[in-house]
């Protein structure tokens, strides 16, 4: 009814304003009426009913089960980072837009812009690498081994079933500083192997390539210098699109000569190990390109170090790997789960010139790093758990303090204090007189391994009952030795 009334009023107002004899005062009065109608419509019940309560596109909430899985994954990855001597930092969730632009190639269009009343032009961070480079330049840091886990934002078309979102966590490890060739790069590959192996994701492979080698290939094929980066962005799509589609984009959208595109196709189809390095060295046309020589020498050394680090079985030299971000300057790599459709679960490479873009004196700090795609990893693990019918514990409670009779809640609380003081994770029911079956059922449903059961008779004798929840085996222990006995049981 409100909308019908408003519509009639709008028609009346329009007739009045259309009149050739309308005065300024009448116009002001009718405008005031329209504003009042707008306010009424905004507060109307119909408008509220049409509001759909949901999260924005490309985002999601996380349940306790999902958060438990997430924290478990991050804990394992952080342990790997710390094992390799990394320290952690944090940076703002948004940056000056100028800091981010010109660093991501064609993906710059995916940056979220912000409006700021203070006059600064801002944007949500697209990744953690560019803010890290900005941090190094601002702080005058020339060497650091750091990890950073935080949310980033991309205005992408998400596919949440495949672990792709607009808001998601990145998990980065980077080594900054002037060091001997390929030593930090090889360690980054070792870190990827350790991390993915610790998570039991199944079989995976790490594809590696070198930006200098790619540039040498483009030059040998006849790609104009000013098209190197845009053609590189096309090659980067080969992990998602067949060669025919990529070739079509090169020729039709980027006006690359068909013969040149075909030459590129003959190279990017190659993959192998150190034997591929030797095969490419026999390519006379390619070896005339200094960039190609430089890239092959680096790849040979990297593969040697991979052998020493015992990761050769996980690494494949793949000429189709491009990684479209503009800031990469050397080795690049990407990890893929072989029996999953989620795409890459880790990627990175060397970016020696990024810090210099922010330094007033253009002083570069060589960097190499890896970003582990934890959102996609969560997606893989959630699917694994669902297919196996598994259940995730959402708490770390070790002991539940239960009572078998009424009016024992004070003693339950005293026992809890003793356990908490001993740094044992414990809880009780928040009812004064809970039923014993309900308490034990709570333990079983939540995976709590041990229950302490108290009763009037046992307390009078100075003992309590310890119950192993899984086996339902019970034994009595002295009340004054309870904490000691619980610690002993948990230790075993």
Where are these regions (language model features)?
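N-terminal mitochondrial targeting presequence
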Residues: 1-25
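Short amphipathic alpha-helical segments that mediate assembly, nucleic-acid/protein binding
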Residues: 3, 7, 27, 228, ...
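Positively charged, Gly/Ser-enriched RNA/tRNA-binding surfaces
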Residues: 34, 66-85, 95-98, 128-140, ...
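Phosphate-rich ligand and nucleic-acid binding surfaces
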Residues: 61, 105, 216-226, 237, ...
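Acidic, His- and aromatic-enriched active-site or binding-groove loops in soluble protein domains
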Residues: 109-119, 223-246, 337-338
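Glycine-rich, mobile lid/loop segments that gate access to catalytic sites or pores
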Residues: 206-217
């Amino acid at each position: 009814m409100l909308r019908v009334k408003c519509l009639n009023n709008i028609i009346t107002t329009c007739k009045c304003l259309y009149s050739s004899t309308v005065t300024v005062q009448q116009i002001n009065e009718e405008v005031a009426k329209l504003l009042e109608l707008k306010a009424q419509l905004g507060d109307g019940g119909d408008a509220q009913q049409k509001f759909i309560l949901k999260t924005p596109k490309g985002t999601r909430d996380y349940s306790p089960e999902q958060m438990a899985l997430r924290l478990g994954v991050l804990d394992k990855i952080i342990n790997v980072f710390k094992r390799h001597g990394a320290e952690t930092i944090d940076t703002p969730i948004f940056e000056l837009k100028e800091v981010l632009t010109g660093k991501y190639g064609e993906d710059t269009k995916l940056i979220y812009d912000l409006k700021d009343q203070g006059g600064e032009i801002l944007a949500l961070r697209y990744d953690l690498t560019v803010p890290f480079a900005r941090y190094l330049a601002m702080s005058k840091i020339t060497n650091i081994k750091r990890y950073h886990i935080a949310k980033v934002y991309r205005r992408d078309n998400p596919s949440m079933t495949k672990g792709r979102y607009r808001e998601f966590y990145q998990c980065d490890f980077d080594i900054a500083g002037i060091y001997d060739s390929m030593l930090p790069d090889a360690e980054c590959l070792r870190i990827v192997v350790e991390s993915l192996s610790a998570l039991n994701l199944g079989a995976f492979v790490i594809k590696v390539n070198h930006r200098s080698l790619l540039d040498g290939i483009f030059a040998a094929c006849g790609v104009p210098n000013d098209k190197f980066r845009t053609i590189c962005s096309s090659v980067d799509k080969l992990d998602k699109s067949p060669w025919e589609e990529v070739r079509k984009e090169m020729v039709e959208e980027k006006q690359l000569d068909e013969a040149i595109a075909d030459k590129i196709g003959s190279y990017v189809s190659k993959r192998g190990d150190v034997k591929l390095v030797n095969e490419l060295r026999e390519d006379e046309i390619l070896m005339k390109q200094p960039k190609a020589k430089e890239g092959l020498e680096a790849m040979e050394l990297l593969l040697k170090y991979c052998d020493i680090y015992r990761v050769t079985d996980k690494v494949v030299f793949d000429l189709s790997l491009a990684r479209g971000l503009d800031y990469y300057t050397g080795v690049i790599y990407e990890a893929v789960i072989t029996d999953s459709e989620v795409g890459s679960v880790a990627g990175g490479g060397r970016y020696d010139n990024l810090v210099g873009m922010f330094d007033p004196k253009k002083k570069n700090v060589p960097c190499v790093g890896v970003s582990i795609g934890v959102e996609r990893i969560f997606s893989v693990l959630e699917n694994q758990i669902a297919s196996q019918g598994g259940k995730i514990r959402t708490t770390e409670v070790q002991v539940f303090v239960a009572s078998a009779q009424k009016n024992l809640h004070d003693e339950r609380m005293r026992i809890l204090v003793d356990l908490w003081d001993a740094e044992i994770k414990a809880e009780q029911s928040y009812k004064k007189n809970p039923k014993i079956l309900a308490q034990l059922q709570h333990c079983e449903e939540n995976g709590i391994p041990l229950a302490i059961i108290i009763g009037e008779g046992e307390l009078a004798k100075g003992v309590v009952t310890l119950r192993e929840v899984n086996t339902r085996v019970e034994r009595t222990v002295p009340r004054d030795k309870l904490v000691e006995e619980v610690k002993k049981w948990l230790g075993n």
